[in-house]
């Protein structure tokens, strides 16, 4: 079968997503994407893979996908893979920029600053930038994350990273082996 990865930030960018206590409890967009895949999945072959970055991890997106949507495969992400940037998106709507900041994203300029709001409304600038954080990994936090995903029911756990410094690449290989991940992707290597 064919695997299909649902990338990062799908839940955080979903204007209809519902959160409680800082966690996702309902999402139209992720449910739609998983359902579309499953509707065309043949005899259970293949897998839908839900990727997560720092913001997704904070919102417990993968745990929701496993527990509520029956997803069995998740992918952790270190950095932006092949891109040496932080996952920027342009936002042309003030309310959406404010919503994203409330969900924990870095939004520039600050969409809740009264001076920024006034400048935006006067046309001084036309868009905000939403940035994703680049996570800093310790072995302890990585082990805890993998253990939590396994306890949540993940059958397969992947890691995606970029072709970074040799020490960081060695860490990815070492952690993937030590914590028995199912796949390591080194993007743009």
Give short role names for the model-derived ranges:
Residues 1-189:
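Active-site entrance/lid segments in N-terminal catalytic domains of soluble metabolic enzymes
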